[in-house]
UniProtKB/Swiss-Prot annotation:
Cellular-component GO terms for this entry: cytosolic small ribosomal subunit
TM stretches of this protein: none
One GO BP: translation
Record domain KH type-2: where: 40-108
Sequence ranges of Low complexity compositional bias: 249-263
Function, in words: Binds the lower part of the 30S subunit head. Binds mRNA in the 70S ribosome, positioning it for translation.
Protein's name in the database: Small ribosomal subunit protein uS3
Region (Disordered): 224-263
Family: Belongs to the universal ribosomal protein uS3 family.
Biased composition (Basic and acidic residues): 239-248
Length: 263
């Protein structure tokens, strides 16, 4: 199953968080919001192509929307003195409506070489610039493994090098276990627009396995109220103390009943 489906979609809710996080009131609103989210992502990826955007997360309420943009080069998105933010806000308002409050956060990707979206985009750009395919793929594999990845798989398909018959070319380095759900697999698909047709680029990156507490931390960030943990520990300590007192009372009572009567 892991070989057939989108590796990101298979892990949503397990070790990946959803990229659109909201709850709609009606089915009609659900459909409208899905279309709006797709329009927002298409606009950002197209306008800021050179910023190498990794992913765009969207959080909504009925009256507001917050967009998180993760990019390798956030300075290109922000512009001089954050002038581009106003342009982005106006564009998103046109999509979702003027009555919706819009917030935009631009975040820098810590290690771009471990983002499948960025690696696939760089490889597609190299193909568009007429870089030899084998050289571009080997450079991408070497860069990702050097960044600390456990494994990488790259699949390029189409009229490679302009040949008449389309074919596939795949490189695999390291361990890429697509069926193991605890494995943090990042997947992305990009396209290289050539004069003789479109070449598809697929990238899978194994960023290691997630165990124990980290396995659940990847799902969502849970914010606890102040003092909740201390109160929880205090309640547990009181419960254990009451339990020990009851046990001691029961033991003393049974011990007294078992003592032989004095003559």
């Amino acid at each position: 199953m892991g070989q057939k489906v989108n590796s990101n979609g298979l892990r949503f809710g397990i070790n990946k968080n959803w990229q659109s996080r909201w709850v709609a009131k009606t089915n009609q609103q659900t459909g409208d919001w899905i279309v709006q989210d797709e329009k927002i992502r298409n606009y950002l990826f197209k306008k800021f192509h050179s910023a190498f955007i990794s992913n765009v997360d969207i959080e909504r309420t009925q009256t507001s929307i917050r967009v998180f943009i993760y990019a390798s080069q956030p300075g290109i998105i922000l512009g001089k003195e954050a002038a581009n933010i106003k342009v982005i806000l106006l564009a998103i308002n046109k999509i979702v409506g003027r009555h919706i409050k819009v917030d935009v956060d631009v975040l820098e990707v810590g290690n771009p070489s471990l983002s499948a979206k960025i690696v696939a985009r760089e490889l597609a750009d190299a193909i568009e610039n007429r870089t030899p395919l084998r050289t571009a793929m080997r450079q991408a594999l070497k860069r990702v493994l050097k960044a600390g990845a456990k494994g990488i798989k790259v699949l390029v398909s189409g009229r490679l090098n302009g040949v008449e018959i389309a074919r596939d070319k795949m490189y695999i380095e390291g361990n890429v276990t697509l069926s193991t759900l605890r494995t943090d697999i990042d997947y992305a698909l990009e396209e290289a627009q050539m004069s003789y047709g479109v070449i598809g680029v697929k990238v899978w990156i194994n960023r290691g396995e997630i165990f124990g507490k980290d396995f659940y931390k990847k799902q969502a960030h849970i914010v606890k109220p102040k003092g909740s943990e201390a109160n929880h520990q205090r309640r547990n300590s009181n419960k254990s103390k009451d339990y020990r007192d009851n046990k001691n009372k029961q033991f003393n009572k049974n011990h007294q009943n078992q003592q032989p009567a004095k003559e």
